[in-house]
Amino acid sequence: MVKKNTKVSNKYIIDATAAVNDKIFDVAAFEKYLIDRIKVDGKTGNLGSSVVVSREGSSKIAVIAHIDFSGRYLKYLTKKFLKKHSLRDWLRVVSTKKGVYELRYYNVVVGNDEEEQ
């Protein structure tokens, strides 16, 4: 049994529209962070043509991988970026559909006790 050498191509989108509109999230810094931190064959800075990180519009990042690449790894790197920039307390990473991740605010419900005081 011989395996065919097929080309795998995955596209992942990270949508940070809400955070960018509130001016608390820098898409350019996040794009640079991903380029610096994504590992290919166990090495950072080894993207080459196998992984392409680009900006789509002013608030979306597209990662196109021509190798086996996990969406969970992208989510992990996004969480690390949020933690590094002290945004993890306000934003979370949610998968809205296959290959699409969105940065959303946590739902904070203020109780009646706090409003009266």
Curated annotation (Swiss-Prot):
Sites of Phosphoserine modification: S49, S50
Protein's UniProt name: Large ribosomal subunit protein eL22
Taxonomy, superkingdom: Eukaryota
Localization (cell): Cytoplasm; Nucleus, Nucleolus
Record organism: Schizosaccharomyces pombe (strain 972 / ATCC 24843)
Family: Belongs to the eukaryotic ribosomal protein eL22 family.
Molecular function via GO: RNA binding; structural constituent of ribosome
A Pfam family the protein falls into: Ribosomal_L22e
PANTHER family, A to Z: 60S RIBOSOMAL PROTEIN L22, LARGE RIBOSOMAL SUBUNIT PROTEIN EL22A-RELATED
Subunit annotation: Component of the large ribosomal subunit (LSU). Mature yeast ribosomes consist of a small (40S) and a large (60S) subunit. The 40S small subunit contains 1 molecule of ribosomal RNA (18S rRNA) and at least 33 different proteins. The large 60S subunit contains 3 rRNA molecules (25S, 5.8S and 5S rRNA) and at least 46 different proteins.
BP terms from Gene Ontology: cytoplasmic translation
UniProt entry tagged with the keyword Ribosomal protein: yes
InterPro entries: Ribosomal_eL22 (IPR002671), Ribosomal_eL22_sf (IPR038526)
Protein role: Component of the ribosome, a large ribonucleoprotein complex responsible for the synthesis of proteins in the cell. The small ribosomal subunit (SSU) binds messenger RNAs (mRNAs) and translates the encoded message by selecting cognate aminoacyl-transfer RNA (tRNA) molecules. The large subunit (LSU) contains the ribosomal catalytic site termed the peptidyl transferase center (PTC), which catalyzes the formation of peptide bonds, thereby polymerizing the amino acids delivered by tRNAs into a polypeptide chain.
Record-level GO cellular component terms: cytosol; cytosolic large ribosomal subunit; nucleolus; preribosome
Primary residence: cytoplasm
Record key words, sorted: Cytoplasm, Nucleus, Phosphoprotein, Ribonucleoprotein, Ribosomal protein
